[in-house]
Design a protein with these regions (language model features):
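Short glycine-rich or small-residue beta-strand-to-loop segments that form or flank ligand, phosphate
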Residues: 12-17, 59-65, 115-117, 144
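Membrane-embedded hairpin module used as a gating/binding unit in multi-pass transport
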Residues: 120-132, 148-161
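Short, surface-exposed amphipathic charged segments that create phosphate/polyanion-binding patches used
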Residues: 53-60, 104-109, 131-132, 155-161
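Short, ordered loop/turn segments at secondary-structure junctions
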Residues: 18-20, 44, 67, 96-97, ...
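Metallocofactor- and cofactor-centric catalytic cores in central/energy metabolism, strongly enriched
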Residues: 1-57, 71, 81-84, 92, ...
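Conserved small/polar residues in nucleotide/adenosyl-binding loops
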Residues: 169-171
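Phosphate/pyrophosphate-binding betaalpha-module
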Residues: 63, 67-129
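Short glycine/threonine-rich loop/turn motifs
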Residues: 95-96, 119-122, 139-151
Length: 172
């Protein structure tokens, strides 16, 4: 859907850089840009508001992809656009929540022994949802930050829990 918009006249797709190489049904955004799609990188969704103000003749399509951490910024961006009366911004959403994704994995992928949970999402949702998953699926869920020492500590914690056949939620 993003590529379809990016190929339309007077439409530009805005996306974060990590989405450029993700394969889609017709190729990646990077591939499609080489075939004429109008795709621009953004560092913040609020850039869409600035661009839409400066170029009202263009429809700015924001690829709103992410989890609990990114959804609020898209909502605030749209609120700002509405308050300013900007009508040339569209969202293509693929926003998910972590817990249903983990639940699906637990129900469909039985060969996973434990989970490293995202610290940035956990700041928003807390640790209780992971505690419930640990009890329900009898697997350890450990929250980690992005630093190497956090990840190593979490791996150590997971290995210890798996060895002892424990299933708890921990934070590194």
């Amino acid at each position: 859907q993003c590529i379809r918009y990016a190929m339309q006249e007077n439409h530009v797709l805005l996306t974060f850089g990590d989405m450029m190489k993700v394969p889609g049904t017709e190729g990646s955004l990077s591939d499609m840009k080489g075939k004429g799609a109008k795709v621009e990188l953004m560092y913040s969704p609020f850039e869409a508001v600035e661009k839409a103000e400066r170029h009202p003749d263009i429809t700015w399509v924001v690829a709103a992809v992410g989890f609990e951490t990114t959804a609020p910024s898209y909502a605030l961006m749209m609120q700002q656009a509405v308050e300013k009366g900007i009508r040339n911004i569209r969202l293509v959403t693929a926003l998910k929540t972590v817990i249903p994704a983990l639940r699906w994995i637990c129900e469909n992928q039985m060969d996973i022994d434990g989970f490293i949970c995202p610290g940035h999402v956990s700041v928003i949702i807390g640790s209780k949802p992971y505690e419930a998953l640990a009890r329900e699926y009898k697997k350890p869920f450990v929250i980690a930050g992005f630093e190497a020492e956090h990840i190593l500590a979490v791996i150590y914690d997971l290995v210890r829990q798996i060895e002892k056949k424990r299933s708890e939620e921990h934070t590194s």
